[in-house]
Amino acid sequence: MARSPRIRIKDNDKAEYARLVKNTKAKIARTKKKYGVDLTAEIDIPDLDSFETRAQFNKWKEQASSFTNRANMRYQFEKNAYGVVASKAKIAEIERNTKEVQRLVDEKIKAMKDKEYYAGGKPQGTIEQRIAMTSPAHVTGINRPHDFDFSKVRSYSRLRTLEESMEMRTDPQYYEKKMIQLQLNFIKSVEGSFNSFDAADELIEELKKIPPDDFYELFLRISEISFEEFDSEGNTVENVEGNVYKILSYLEQYRRGDFDLSLKGF
């Protein structure tokens, strides 16, 4: 393979190099002064005579031009009233991810809203009606985030939390893991409510047999499958024990196939 010929520096190369160096240094200085962000490590400024080939020089010119281009949001910044600085690229990414999470949550609520929910062994309305009486997050265990507003971010730690949370929640596996954790947490809640109660032990074993997505729908549709029923200090022992028997009755119906779990895998 033939080697690329060594570059011959022309006057127009010198002029373009000087212009790009000037613009690059000005960009670095301006960003440091206005936003406190040091971009020195983001772009090299080699001596002109260090380029061995025209290809090397052209590649650097592209990098320098991109670095100083106002359309490159990676190197454009905003500073809010709390002194938090972020690149416009990061702000736009969090906004996109937030919108995607909102879309996913809306889809999930739409898929479940017409399902009946039960209390005391009887249908009491739809999940949508239950949500209207409380909130989507209370019923579904899924929080719908508000629109991202950078002007309200008070600290860098809050910005990182929002960035990481929204990115994580765009992954479909997030919701699968959440269903698994919800089931485990509920089982622990039942376990922590009794020292010795045969029916509770039976309930725990039955709950462990249920696939997480089935459990999630049962959690949505059966009011007795609720953390409040077991964690509330106001509940008497008799009430909690009675709730165990109610849930066991529901699970017997579940095993017989009396519940249409059409949200499975949604």
UniProtKB/Swiss-Prot annotation:
Residues that the record marks as modified (O-(5'-phospho-DNA)-serine) are S232
Per the UniProt entry, the effect of G257V is:
90% loss of primer activity
Start and end residues of each stretch annotated as Intermediate: 74-172
Keywords from the UniProt entry: Coiled coil, Covalent protein-DNA linkage, Degradation of host cell envelope components during virus entry, Degradation of host peptidoglycans during virus entry, DNA replication, DNA-binding, Early protein, Host nucleus, Hydrolase, Phosphoprotein, Viral DNA replication, Viral genome packaging, Viral release from host cell, Virion, Virus entry into host cell
Query: What InterPro entries does the annotation carry?
Result: DNA_terminal_Gp3 (IPR008770), DNA_terminal_Gp3_C (IPR043124), DNA_terminal_Gp3_sf (IPR037216)
Q: Which GO biological process categories is it annotated with?
A: DNA replication, synthesis of primer; symbiont entry into host cell via disruption of host cell envelope; symbiont entry into host cell via disruption of host cell wall peptidoglycan; viral DNA genome packaging; viral DNA genome replication
Cell compartment(s), UniProt: Virion; Host nucleus
Question: Known consequence of changing G257D?
Answer: 90% loss of primer activity
Q: What would changing F230V do, according to UniProt? A: Formation of TP-dTMP is directed by the third nucleotide of the template strand instead of the second
The UniProt entry, under Gene3D superfamilies, shows: 6.10.250.960, DNA terminal protein Gp3, priming domain
Q: What is its main location?
A: virion
The UniProt annotation puts motif Nuclear localization signal at 25-34
Which branch of life, at top level?
Viruses
Q: Give the coiled coil ranges.
A: 86-113
Q: What are the record's GO terms for cellular component?
A: host cell nucleus; viral terminase complex; virion component
Can the keyword GTP-binding be found in this entry's annotation? Answer: no
How is this protein organized at the quaternary level?
Interacts with the viral polymerase; this interaction allows the initiation of TP-primed DNA replication at both viral DNA ends. Binds to ssDNA. Interacts with the replication protein p1. Part of a DNA-gp3-gp16 complex.
Tell me its family: Belongs to the phi29likevirus DNA terminal protein family.
> What is the protein name for this chain?
Primer terminal protein
The organism of origin for this protein: Bacillus phage phi29 (Bacteriophage phi-29)
